[in-house]
């Protein structure tokens, strides 16, 4: 029998990892940005997108019960269609996380410049340190990594709940009138931005083989995390609108202004701490899920089998993590040397993420029956993702190029069929 990933994750740790994967730095700026664009109506959009996120979560929860695999969403597509389809989706994902995660790290590190006059190279160094710490923790094993994630998420939730609580007394009903100052078109325009605040659920599914009871614990983790994330987003949007903490200052200043109404001048420092904690939690969870997905692809022979090795002592995909560290370094170096705009860098990975959701929902429509509530959730999510994907512009080509590269690789290599020794 081939060695397996170590089963050590509980539903508590799974919930923390899931929250970390979804709750990005967008929570620090989007409530104010969307309120500035759509007014109080932005709160309605946050509620609607929170509801839509349960469609995605419900579908993933059903799929995990069918195939609790380290392949995650690639395993579901493979099961629904064929091995090549799952492998091609895996190649699409190869072009998302390795670029997206360093961008997240840079975004979080950028917030430090609001309390210090950090130079660009210092911001890049801070981002690199966060990535390096996360990689090293994952190399030490999923148990330690999950415990750290749980601790960080507890700190984040405490700070956010405290910020909301101290702001509630300053909420006034008058700030919610008029509800639609810029019309429904403005409310619709912010929906795409808000949608990206609810992506990342799929990153917990590749950890299924490391849960004690994946069929029960993964769905529980997904639904608890979805409830927590939705509650935080909606309440933060509510107090942002109700205290009119938007439209007057820059991105981070809006949240700092909100927190300062209850916490005084320390608001900006609390905000920066939140930014760093949230950034680390996000990159940590994404590295966890993605490294297992790549390991599973190598295990199946869909990418070079060199990456299908586990550490003999920690049962972690050590070679994948090392390769990720190298790619992260290249992305940071490219950004530092050529000053590539982060928004431009993010367009490709964003399109790849949406494409992965479309493929996953299509797989669910085939695997689940129409009498299953998960089928209807998948249908709603499929339609929503397809519409959003159509607005990706030139980035539409990015997933297509990655898919073509994967198809070419499998065509030339023919897929490795030999059995592997999965332990170093």
Curated annotation (Swiss-Prot):
Principal cellular location given in the protein's record: membrane
InterPro entries assigned: AA/rel_permease1 (IPR002293), APC_superfamily (IPR050367)
Organism: Bacillus subtilis (strain 168)
This protein's GO CC annotations: plasma membrane
Transmembrane residue ranges: 9-29, 41-61, 86-106, 119-139, 148-168, 184-204, 222-242, 270-290, 320-340, 345-365, 377-397
Family: Belongs to the amino acid-polyamine-organocation (APC) superfamily.
Any one GO molecular-function label of the UniProt entry: transmembrane transporter activity
Annotated localization: Cell membrane
Superkingdom per UniProt: Bacteria
Keywords from the named record: Amino-acid transport, Cell membrane, Membrane, Transmembrane, Transmembrane helix, Transport
GO biological process, one term: amino acid transport
Protein name, per record: Uncharacterized amino acid permease YecA
Pfam families per the UniProt record, alphabetical: AA_permease_2
Topological type in the membrane: Multi-pass membrane protein
């Amino acid at each position: 029998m081939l060695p397996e990933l170590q089963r050590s994750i509980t539903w508590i740790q799974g919930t923390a990892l899931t929250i970390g994967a979804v709750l990005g730095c967008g929570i620090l700026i989007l409530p104010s940005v969307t309120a500035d664009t759509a007014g109080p109506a932005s709160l309605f959009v946050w509620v609607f997108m929170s509801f839509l996120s349960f469609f995605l979560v419900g579908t993933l929860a059903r799929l995990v019960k069918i195939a609790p695999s380290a392949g995650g969403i690639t395993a579901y597509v493979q099961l629904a269609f064929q091995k090549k389809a799952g492998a091609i989706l895996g190649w699409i994902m190869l072009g998302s996380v390795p670029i997206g995660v360093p961008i997240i790290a840079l975004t979080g590190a950028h917030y430090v410049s609001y309390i210090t006059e950090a130079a660009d190279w210092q911001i890049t160094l801070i981002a690199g340190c966060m990535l390096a710490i996360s990689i090293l923790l994952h190399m030490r094993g999923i148990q330690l990594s999950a415990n750290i994630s749980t601790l960080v998420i507890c700190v984040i939730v405490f700070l956010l709940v405290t910020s909301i609580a101290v702001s509630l007394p300053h909420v006034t009903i008058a700030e919610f009138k008029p509800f639609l100052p810029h019309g429904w078109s403005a409310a619709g325009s912010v929906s795409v931005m808000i949608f990206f605040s609810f992506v990342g659920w799929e990153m917990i599914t590749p950890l299924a083989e490391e849960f004690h009871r994946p069929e029960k614990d993964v769905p529980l983790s997904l639904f608890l995390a979805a409830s927590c994330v939705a509650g935080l987003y909606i309440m933060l949007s509510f107090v942002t609108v109700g205290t009119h903490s938007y439209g007057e200052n820059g991105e981070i200043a809006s949240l700092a202004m909100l927190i300062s109404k209850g916490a005084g001048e320390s608001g900006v420092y609390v905000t920066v701490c939140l930014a760093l904690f949230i950034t680390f939690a996000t990159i940590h969870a994404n590295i966890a899920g993605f490294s297992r997905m790549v390991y599973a692809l190598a295990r199946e022979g869909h990418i070079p089998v060199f990456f299908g090795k586990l550490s003999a002592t920690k049962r972690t995909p050590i070679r994948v993590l090392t390769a990720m560290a190298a790619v992260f370094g290249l992305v940071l170096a490219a950004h530092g040397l050529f000053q590539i705009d982060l928004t431009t860098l993010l367009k490709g990975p964003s399109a790849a993420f949406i494409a992965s959701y479309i493929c996953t929902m299509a797989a669910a429509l085939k695997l689940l029956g129409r009498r299953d509530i998960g089928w209807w959730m998948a249908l709603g999510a499929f339609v929503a993702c397809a519409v959003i994907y159509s607005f990706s512009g030139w980035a539409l080509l990015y997933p297509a190029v990655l898919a073509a590269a994967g198809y070419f690789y499998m065509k030339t290599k023919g897929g490795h069929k030999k059995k592997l020794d999965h332990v170093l």
